[in-house]
Amino acid sequence: MTLVDVRTPDPKRFIPGATGDWEVIVGMEVHAQVLSNSKLFSGASTEFGKPQNSNVSLVDAAMPGMLPVINEECVKQAVRTGLGLKAEINKRSVFDRKNYFYPDLPQGYQISQYKDPIVGEGRIVISLGPDRQGQFEDIEIGIERLHLEQDAGKSMHDQHATMSYVDLNRSGVALMEIVSKPDMRSSDEAKAYMTKLRSIVRYLGTCDGNMDEGSMRADVNVSVRRPGEPFGTRCEIKNVNSIRFIGQAIEYEARRQIGILEDGGEIEQETRLFDPNKGETRSMRSKEDAHDYRYFPDPDLLPLEFDDAFIKTLEADLPELPDDKKERFVRELGLSVYDASVLVSEKAIADYFEAVAAGRDGKTAANWVINDLLGALNRTGKDIEQTPVSPAQLGAIIDLIKAGTISGKIAKDLFEIVLTEGGDPAEIVELRGMKQVTDTGAIEKAVDEIIAANPEQVEKVKAKPTMAAWFVGQVMKATGGKANPQAVQALVKAKLGIEE
């Protein structure tokens, strides 16, 4: 891969050192497990969490005479992902053997793709912000390639005092290795890139993106240089399995390399591991080059070839992706860029919002989903799939406000009841006497009582009409928040002689 610098040095991303400014250069190789029922070259299940060595075929265990057979669904998923990345789809690709020895690699080689990957160059647009002026910065990150390969098994060194165990459940599972160009210039950009990539594959249904289960793992390449100078020597941080850790690993590694260079040392090209407990990287091994793996075409697999019709069929079935959905939310529903960005960040959130917004005001639905629902889920440590409030329930609360049955304040209380206890919002309002008081006579009586009991406040209102809000608050308090706020405000102003 020829490295090309497409970014103009940006002072706000420079890292100050003892001898001047530095710039960090980041590229990523993301391993995304393909969503499929069976493995890349065998019929064994890919189900997560099964007992050790229960999802293993003779092919996965490298029994003599067992030949690989390509899984067509994995090929389709790779092409779908390539299309979602706005990438070039290569109609001819080749599987190669990547030779190295490890106990959890029973074949003694990994079937991967080297010179002829299934997907070529593409791009992802990330968005940073908002800044203090509420503006977002869009940055295009290049994709170098996407190729298919087998995952290895898992070595377990903590099961026995003198022996290591090997679990081959993961061996042979299809991976998409998505290689970015070295276009990122900060840890924030790298985190935004990983977040966006995970969102895209989840929308496409090609990877579940569950980093805690190992479905997405990142090898992060980090180097530093003086602004405007050629790329420096990079170090690869292997298998970083959370977005937060990606940011921490980059920041530590950049500082480590800057320290070495400022002390007159040189950076050694090597592979490192990130220790999340210490928040630092440590050396693992010297970095291998391609020739160390002795790549050659796998003689058991023919080149993978398909035509334009195959690609067009898959393209026709692609779902609406995050950027397109965000643009539609802004254009059709009048949402702010920020609100639309939050709502499309996860497919499950976007689906929930669209169910709530159907037939209702989009801005109102967005406010409830972002501020109330997501806020409550964040407080309780749950995600959108675990929400106790269904779209129908939240929609019903919004409908009750619009109908004038409840006020906005009562709606907040109703939401908390539905969140903790469940139930039909309309029935809860009826059974608990939460209906808004719209009887003008009853409201007028409450207003008269508050005014009569507070002559000093009445005098203050004459000097400062905005003090009328105090009376509105007192009436709402006296009625338990059930009085119609608009009716209260109108009566208070009329009684106090305040002109509209």
Swiss-Prot record:
Keywords: ATP-binding, Ligase, Nucleotide-binding, Protein biosynthesis. PROSITE patterns: GATB. One of its GO terms (biological process) is translation. It catalyses: L-glutamyl-tRNA(Gln) + L-glutamine + ATP + H2O = L-glutaminyl-tRNA(Gln) + L-glutamate + ADP + phosphate + H(+); L-aspartyl-tRNA(Asn) + L-glutamine + ATP + H2O = L-asparaginyl-tRNA(Asn) + L-glutamate + ADP + phosphate + 2 H(+). Its EC number is 6.3.5.-. InterPro entries: Asn/Gln-tRNA_amidoTrfase_suB/E, Asn/Gln-tRNA_Trfase_suB/E_cat, Asn/Gln_amidotransferase, Asn/Gln_tRNA_amidoTrase-B-like, GatB, GatB_C_1, GatB_Yqey_C_2, Gln-tRNA_amidoTrfase_suB_CS. It is an enzyme of class 6 (ligase). Disulfide bonds: none annotated. One of its GO terms (molecular function) is glutaminyl-tRNA synthase (glutamine-hydrolyzing) activity. The keyword Coiled coil does not apply. Belongs to the GatB/GatE family. GatB subfamily. Allows the formation of correctly charged Asn-tRNA(Asn) or Gln-tRNA(Gln) through the transamidation of misacylated Asp-tRNA(Asn) or Glu-tRNA(Gln) in organisms which lack either or both of asparaginyl-tRNA or glutaminyl-tRNA synthetases. The reaction takes place in the presence of glutamine and ATP through an activated phospho-Asp-tRNA(Asn) or phospho-Glu-tRNA(Gln). Heterotrimer of A, B and C subunits. This is Aspartyl/glutamyl-tRNA(Asn/Gln) amidotransferase subunit B. It comes from Rhizobium etli (strain ATCC 51251 / DSM 11541 / JCM 21823 / NBRC 15573 / CFN 42). The gene is gatB.
